[in-house]
Structure formats: structure tokens, C-alpha cells
Regions:
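Short S/T/G/P-rich N-terminal loop/turn motif that feeds into the first structured element of a domain
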Residues: 1-46, 50-62, 71-97
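Cytochrome P450 catalytic domain signature, combining two hallmark sequence patches
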Residues: 65-67
């Protein structure tokens, strides 16, 4: 599992409305670990993909760019953080393949 971040700078209230609209179009079952963090100056999405190659493919895809454009989100600052060693919730470990 590979973790990356998407940083959107701007009015967090506006960005969150747009993010919620975009996320409504994504299949929830496709999200391995997905977190949206409100900041004073924007939002940051923490997201995982099965591999670094999958993260790069998704984050640079025309489909992702189209999803951003459809709801008026700006191009984010994308950071490929690295491979996840452990992910845990109160329900227990998150499977990492």
C-alpha cells in the first residue's frame, strides 16, 4: 500500500464543498485508506493506492484531472509519501498488501 497526499490551498469551506461533490462520484469500495483534513488555509487529502505505480498513474490521469475540473477544484500539490508499513484503526489493522 502506497500513501500520498493532495494539498489544495484556498478557502477550506469552499474546497470542502467541492471535495464532497467529487468524492460522491468515486466508488467507496475503491478507497483503501482515505482521510480529508481541514487546514486554516485549505484542505489536504491523505490517500492510499495499492502501489506507487498505481498512485502515480491515478494522480496524473486525465480521469482524476476531469474529476477535479468537474467540481472546480484546483490542481493540487501532489506528494508521493512512500509505502505504508502499518495502518491501524480501533477495529484493528488495515490490511496492507
Amino acid at each position: 500500500m502506497h500513501l500520498g497526499t493532495y494539498r489544495f490551498d484556498g478557502d477550506p469551506d469552499d474546497l470542502l464543498v467541492r471535495y464532497d461533490r467529487m468524492l460522491a462520484g468515486f466508488p467507496v469500495d475503491d478507497l483503501l485508506v482515505h482521510v480529508c483534513v481541514r487546514r486554516n488555509d485549505g484542505i489536504t487529502i491523505i490517500d492510499t493506492c495499492p502501489s506507487a505505480a498505481d498512485f502515480h498513474s491515478f494522480s496524473t490521469s486525465a480521469g482524476f484531472r476531469g474529476a477535479l475540473d468537474a467540481v472546480g477544484l484546483p490542481q493540487p500539490i501532489v506528494d508521493s509519501m512512500g509505502d505504508v508499513h502499518l495502518a491501524r484503526t480501533p477495529a484493528g489493522p488495515v490490511p496492507i498488501a
